[in-house]
Structure formats: structure tokens, C-alpha cells
Amino acid sequence: MTIRILNIAIVLVALLLSGLLVRKFFFQRSAQNPNYQLAANEKLRINGINWADSDRTVLLALSKECKYCARSAEFYRRLAAGIAKRNNMRMLAVFSEKESEADAYLRQLEVPIRDLRYASFSSLGIKSVPTVAIVDRNGVVTYMWVGKLPPLEEKDLMSKLGLEDTRSPDEWSITEANLRAKLAHKEQVTLIDIRDRTAYATNHRDEARNIPLDELPVRAQNELSLDETIVLYSNDPSETDLAYSILETQGFTHVLLLVPDATPPSE
């Protein structure tokens, strides 16, 4: 009996800690974190940069030692390709003044950014890398993101710049129709409903397992296989996007978001 009570206590503590991890993960990536100095509507000053040279500048704060910077390289390449087609936008890479040979690092990542500066991150209010900020011609930060972005945030960033995201949706999402087809053909797909237990108990798909978002960091490592295809479901797209980031950080490489079927065009 004592061992059983101890095991239950350990599980409850693990779930509590996982909830704290989710909240920490989410708020660290929020541009409105009061502890994060650089935020939207703040003016940014970098020596040698005249913001008025472009209507908008996409600033990337990077580090050669940052694994999430390297893992975001494919997105940065798509971003650079879209910006290169516009005359009123540019990209600017900023590295810490303590680093060197950042240009060689960008070539290694195959991210074509010509404007490169070294600066004190603390003086700019940048506490985490990678950081992406959209800066207007007056040097005012209009939007910013921190960390490796999940698919919907990548699309949101591109949309705010008026750019089309060329990444195939098939790489990160699956439609209802395609999911039904995979299940009908008995393909190995694990559908995870990340809503809370009450919502799941009220109504859920027969084939879905319930792992609430606040339990995901702990339970995913213990209950899911890195080799399986995982489909995430929730009524809130921002929650599935966050869940995608959590699983990606833990090494899951076959993660898809369940999205509605496309609406056929009206005649």
C-alpha cells in the first residue's frame, strides 16, 4: 500500500511539473513577456543601420552555438527567398559582439543574408535566440517571435510580410479526408486529442487518445514512440501549434496537425 501511494504521488508531481513546463515554454516565446525587454512598439537602434532604407526589415538575432537557429535554417531560407523578390524589404542578421565569422556560419546554413551586424544583445534587449523581429522604416518593432517557430507561426510571420509560405502543408498537416483514408487502410497513425479531460469526456473521436496539453511534456516521452506518426487534434489551433513545438523539441519527427478539409470553390 505504501509503495502504491508513493507511485501515485510521483505521477502527480510529474504531471504538475509538466504543466509548469508548458506554461514556461509558452510564455518564454511570447513577445509580451514583461521580463523580455524587446517587444512590439519599441524602437530599436543598431549602429550603422538606417531603417529608412527599407519599408520593413526582418531582423534575425542568431548565434552559432544555438541549435534552434540551425534547426530553423530551412525556414530562414524560405523567408530570404520571398524577401529577395521584394524591393521594399530586407533581411538583417545580428550576432553577439562576442562571436566572429558569422558570415561563414550563414553560408554553412545556406541562408543568404547580406546585411550582417555584431551587437550587444543585452543592449538591444534580446535575451533569447533565435529572435525574429519585423522592424518598420522608423526602427519600431511591429512584430516579434522567439524560438524555433512551429508551422502556423511560420505561416503567420510570412503572412504579415505579404509573402506566400512555400513549405508544403503535407510536411506538417493532414486533412480529415486523408486521416480517414490512413485509418481505413490500417496505417500506423496515433491521433492525440490534447484538449482537457472534461472536453474529451464530453465528446471525442473513437480512435483518439487523450493527452491534455499540460501533461504532454511528461507523458509523450513515456507513452509515445519517436518512430510513430502522431496527429495532433484540438479545437484551438494555437494549442496544437504549441504541442507540435513540444514534441519537436523532444525529438519527434513525424508530427502532423489535423486541419479541416479544404472548402470547395463555389460556382
Residue ranges and their predicted role:
Residues 7-23:
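Hydrophobic membrane-insertion alpha-helices, especially the h-region
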Residues 50-70, 76, 192-193:
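Short active-site neighborhood of thiol/selenol oxidoreductases, capturing the structured segment around
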Residues 70-109:
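Structural microenvironment flanking redox-active thiols in thiol-disulfide oxidoreductases
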Residues 108-111, 118-158:
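Thiol/disulfide oxidoreductase modules built on the thioredoxin-like
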Residues 168-238, 242:
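Positively charged, proline/Ser/Thr-rich regional signature most characteristic
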